[in-house]
Swiss-Prot record:
GO terms for molecular function: argininosuccinate lyase activity. It is found in: Cytoplasm. InterPro entries: Arg_succ_lyase_C (IPR029419), Argininosuccinate_lyase (IPR009049), Fumarase/histidase_N (IPR024083), Fumarate_lyase_CS (IPR020557), Fumarate_lyase_fam (IPR000362), Fumarate_lyase_N (IPR022761), L-Aspartase-like (IPR008948). This is Argininosuccinate lyase. It comes from the Bacteria. The lineage of its organism: Bacteria, Bacillati, Bacillota, Bacilli, Bacillales. It comes from Staphylococcus epidermidis (strain ATCC 35984 / DSM 28319 / BCRC 17069 / CCUG 31568 / BM 3577 / RP62A). Pathway: Amino-acid biosynthesis; L-arginine biosynthesis; L-arginine from L-ornithine and carbamoyl phosphate: step 3/3.
Length: 463
């Protein structure tokens, strides 16, 4: 007799190496909590609908809990010959309680069973990711609060462009994460749907109650189409996309952390707790955590591409190709959660070298736009002002000086309307103060931005 749940149709057994290739237990054992949760809801519903007895249901439920506990305590080992988490649990259940265990699968297929597990898992993980993002945002806001008046060079093309507030710069990542969080929150509408009861693809002849299992499992909605219920993996693609994009944002931040911590920049000092050394160069302090996060975006994006290609051209309904949805999702979720925790600790513990930042911004031409704006305030057309300032900058480069070093007489050779007040106008501090357009880097604008950000975080906490 075959030990396969589907063995009745077959005359020969697969060889062991075929079982190993076919099996998913090595990774879908991670779904034991969700599988037991779904089976308990299903057993409860079967009893309620008088498909099995109350005693049978209670026996099933009690032993499912014992199986989960035994596995988590290392007392139970699953077998590749039983393929997956579903059949391993069912086999163990029947071994323990006999015939009643074989009734659990009534009105259910592994197709809707695994879909239910994956919906439960993805929902739980997305909710946790949302919490991690919000926590990291809190850390960013706290750091920004301390550095509203800290001035640093703003860059375009990795060339110094204009003076900006350090708070304004790092708050950019708050808003990236806010969009990421919003995407995850919105995706819950498409994750929080119960496929349980769809069976293999067409529903079941048994008088099941899908609304009851939906309620027991805490799903917000039901799939309206049984074929769609077992075929849908859109929510996994969507989750992988949101993870990948969040990782892209973390990667961009990591690149800046790496640059800021170089001896050439010295804008920040990373904590030893988030750095490593060299096995040959004793002086080294490497930003390995930031580098790892920057690199890990490759694997999460790879999982997204893999899932999209796996689904391309798949006919309805379930196909074994769908077994490939799990490892990538599990790894991507693990990667993002770890990256968010590491990044929060790294940012919370890093030292911002305010004096170095302010000194750096005094030795460049990032106030050149300010000089052009000054001329515009003297009724000079902007394009003309741009040309004049370009010539002044070129002259300064030849002389090895900066705009604040140019004598007034030399300024007036370029335009007679330039007066003594130009020197106050061009200080980095005043460059910031004058930028008060909504969302700009000026102190008052940044303070308002922080107020809005704090209100958003408080609002999210109350939901």
């Amino acid at each position: 007799m075959s030990n396969k749940a589907w063995g009745g149709r077959f005359e020969t057994q697969p060889e062991e190496w075929v079982d190993d290739f076919n099996a998913s237990i090595d990774f879908d054992k991670n779904l034991i909590k969700q599988d037991v949760q779904g089976s308990i809801a299903h057993a409860t519903m079967l009893a309620k609908q008088h498909i099995i007895t109350d005693d049978e249901a209670q026996s099933i439920i009690n032993e499912l809990k014992n199986i989960q506990s035994d596995f988590e305590e290392g007392k139970l080992k699953f077998k590749a010959s039983l393929e997956d988490i579903h059949l391993n649990i069912e086999h163990e259940l029947i071994q323990r309680i006999g015939e009643a265990g074989g009734k659990l699968h009534t009105g259910r297929s592994r197709n809707d069973q695994v879909a239910t597990d994956m919906h439960l898992y993805t929902k739980e993980q997305v909710q946790y990711i949302i919490e991690l993002i919000a926590s990291f945002q809190e850390t960013i806001v706290q750091l920004a609060d301390q550095h509203v008046d800290t001035i640093m060079p703003g860059y375009t093309h990795l060339q110094r462009a204009q003076p900006i507030s350090f708070a304004h710069h790092i708050m950019t990542y708050f808003w990236m994460l806010e969009r990421d969080k919003g995407r995850f929150m919105d995706s819950l509408k498409r994750i929080d749907i119960s496929p349980l009861g769809a069976a293999a693809l067409s529903g079941t002849t048994h008088p099941i109650d899908r609304h009851l299992t939906q309620e027991l499992l805490g799903f917000a909605n039901l799939y309206e189409n049984s074929l769609d219920a077992v075929s849908d993996r859109d929510y996994i693609v969507e989750t992988l996309h949101h993870i990948s994009l969040t990782m892209v944002h973390l990667s961009r931040f990591a690149e800046e952390i790496i640059f800021w911590s170089t001896d050439e920049a010295k804008f920040i000092t990373l904590s030893d707790a988030f750095s490593t050394g060299s096995s040959i160069m004793p002086q080294k302090k490497n930003p390995d955590m930031a580098e790892l996060i920057r690199g890990k975006v490759g694997r999460t994006t790879g999982h997204l591409m893999s899932m999209l290609v796996t689904l391309k051209g798949l006919p309805l309904a379930y196909n074994k190709d769908m077994q490939e949805d799990k490892e990538g999702l599990f790894d991507a979720v693990h990667t993002l959660k770890g990256s968010l925790r590491i990044f929060e600790g790294m940012v919370a513990s890093m030292k911002v070298n305010s004096n170095r930042l302010s000194q750096t911004v005094k030795n460049d031409f990032s106030n050149a736009t300010e000089l052009a704006d000054y001329l515009v305030s003297k009724s000079v057309p902007f394009r003309t002002a741009h040309e004049i300032v370009g010539k002044i900058v070129l002259n300064c480069i030849h002389k090895g000086i900066y705009l604040l070093d140019v004598p007034l007489s030399e300024y007036q050779e370029h335009h007679e309307n330039i007066e003594e007040d130009i020197y106050d106008y061009l200080t980095p501090e005043n460059c910031l103060k004058r930028r008060q357009s909504y969302g700009s880097t000026g102190q008052e604008s940044v303070k308002h931005q922080l107020k809005v950000a704090k209100a958003l975080l408080k609002d999210n906490e109350s939901k």
